[in-house]
Amino acid sequence: MNRHGMRWPSSSATIAAAFAALLLVISGAALAAGDVAAVPWPTTGWEASTPEAQGVASSALADLVEFGAKSEMDSLLVVRHGRIVTEAYYAPFRPGMRHLVNSVTKAVVGTLAGIAVQRGEIASVDEPVLESFPWRAVANAEGTKAQLKIAHLLDMTSGLDWNEPLTSAPPETMLEMARSRDWVGFVLDRPMAHAPGTAFNYNSGDWHLVSAILARKTWLDTLEYARRTLFAPLGIADATWRADPQGIRSGGFGLSLQPRDMAKIGYLYLQRGRWAGQRIVSEAWIDRVFHATVDMNLGSTPRFRYASGWWTIPEKRAYLAVGFQRQLIIVLPDSDLVAVVTGKRNYPLLPLIDRLAAAAAAKTALPADAEGNARLADRVRDAALEKATPVGPASPLAATISGKVWRFDRNPLGLRSLLLDLTASEPRFRADYEGGSAEAPRRIEGPVGLDGISRSHAAGELVLAVKARWLGTDTLEFVSHLVNEGVVMTSAITFRGNEADVAFASNQGFTLRLHAVATD
């Protein structure tokens, strides 16, 4: 035995075997280092490639971009072998914009939890949740709630009583939390519907507790922790994140990222937690996602499973971060592919995954396809052009209603008044909301498109695109689109003298009736 505690082989045969094994280890290490060098790392920016050079059919991607237009996507990005093979932005969304990713936030928070475990800031996902909040007098703390562990939050099997269905029904409990003054307390105080670990139930409150635990364990705001441990290594510099009234970043939603940066998160998982030779998150954590065991009970075939903020389809070896209105990061390891989608409405996931897998079925480069590439380029250009909504003739009421301030009854939107100027050469609107003062009103104002094409302008950190058209002589349809959030709000305003009735609806399923009275 040598001074390092290693026993030398005792025969020439074993010496030869050991030498061969040593060569294998050395060559394997060299190969691994070579692999790292060969893999494109988009820290400072993504490389682009023709689809066929990466074994992807450009004609199939053209069909996919067209599908995106019909499905109200805001962006579509496909990466194969570490290179972008198509990238489409659907007007009025544009390259370089952040997009609210909704529940894709959960996958990012799950990744941060994995990093915290790897760094020892969270000792184990088996830690009891209540131990992270020793100063709180938690309601219903007796019984099964004491058994609640961080792992249950990560898999949404907390057992807390929570109504946030993955359907068109309103997420009642999530909305209650968002209206409360203490989100963490609201979640912790929920009664138990099941014992922890016994049933999956979609619950953004679970994830808000994970964010709160991260902030407590790391002594950092969750966004700052993300910047230091995840975003900076991946080259993600443009992110915003909603916080609760106490300043804790929302764990279940509220993160905004650019699509290219969303793709980096997916690429990190495709590379099993490594990035340019650096271990960002442990391979064991990636395996926790890739071998998810919690059935989501969606009643679909194939079945979906869940782990650490990610949806998985074991039968297809597909891994997805999924946000409301189809904000998506899709990882297909068998195809060496990552796809990102942002958008404004839900649609079936499985056909999209099948389209992506079929487009990247080839294992080697394909012959150049000039016709297919031209068609793809045409579809991408077409996506960037807004399609005009049909408009009819202007109503004689346009002059009558313009310049008046329409004051609304108290309402959930907080909308106090609306002023329209529809007769100017550049029509405009002005909306005042609760929360401001006479000297400094909380106000949004900007141009309105009356030709079927929306007019975009900055509204704080957001971009608002607005257009209007007459539906007959007394009803004005007013459409405002929060471009960065995928939220479209349509108001049918019916004027009756100095009064107006408004039927408001959003693409998120929210409807409301409002009433206003005009003042000069």
Q: What residues fall within each predicted segment?
A:
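Structured C-terminal helix/loop/strand segments within mature extracytoplasmic catalytic/sensor domains
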Residues: 323-389
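Peripheral terminal and inter-domain segments
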Residues: 370-520
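A small/polar active-site loop signature that marks catalytic segments
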Residues: 163-243
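Active-site Gly/Thr loop motif
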Residues: 238, 286-339
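N-terminal leader/targeting segments and the immediately adjacent pre-domain N-terminus
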Residues: 2-3, 12-15, 19-94, 99, ...
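Active-site-proximal alpha-helical segments within enzyme catalytic domains
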Residues: 206-213, 253-274, 327-344
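Active-site helix/loop module of the DD-peptidase/beta-lactamase fold
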Residues: 100, 119-160, 189-191, 218-257
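Active-site SXXK
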Residues: 82, 99-125, 153, 210-214, ...
